[in-house]
Regions:
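A structural signal for small-residue-enriched, beta-sheet-centric alpha/beta enzyme cores
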Residues: 1-20, 24, 30-166
Length: 166
């Protein structure tokens, strides 16, 4: 994936039009950024089972695309907060064979329990040159001992996710 679009207030799951809304959202983002719809990750958090309208995406995505910048990480980390009391973002640089590499991440999730679940959304990016198979293996292994150990109320949300883009 090349882009992520996240919304809050509506989980876009267990409703009549969730798949269609997600597909149309990815098309809108792709059009605004000049990429393919399959290169867009769509993430949603909020109330489960509510109908969702495409209209906020139709009006909001063009404006969001214009505001994209390399310095926008803090705005993005703040924007995905729901009941979080602090934004969660980090970036580190390190050397691999004499080349400077960067790994960054942001997350949303704290104690949002409505209805009876908590959603965490996690987005990791890196400029490390790594194959899709190797990064998937690394992500799967680390998720087992970190992300999958989180619990707030004992339930997994329909929308919990962690993604990595390299």
């Amino acid at each position: 994936a090349i882009a992520v679009i996240a919304n809050s207030k509506n989980a876009n799951t267990c409703n009549a039009n969730g798949v269609e809304i997600a597909e149309e959202t990815s098309k809108l983002v792709a059009s605004a950024l000049g990429i393919k719809p399959e290169e867009v990750i769509v993430a949603s958090t909020g109330v489960i089972g509510e109908p969702m309208s495409i209209e906020p995406f139709q009006t909001g995505i063009p404006n969001l695309a214009k505001q994209l910048s390399a310095e926008g990480h803090t705005d993005a980390a703040t924007a995905i907060m729901t009941t979080d009391t602090v934004k969660k973002e980090v970036a580190v640089s390190f050397m691999i064979q004499g080349k400077k590499c960067t790994l960054g991440g942001m997350a949303k999730g704290s104690g949002m329990i409505h209805p009876n679940m908590a959603t965490t959304l996690n987005f990791i990016t890196t400029d490390v040159c790594i194959s899709a198979a190797l990064i998937q293996k690394a992500l799967s292994e680390i998720v087992k001992i970190t992300y999958n150990c989180l619990t707030i109320d004992g339930d997994t949300s329909t929308n919990d996710m962690v993604s990595v883009m390299a």
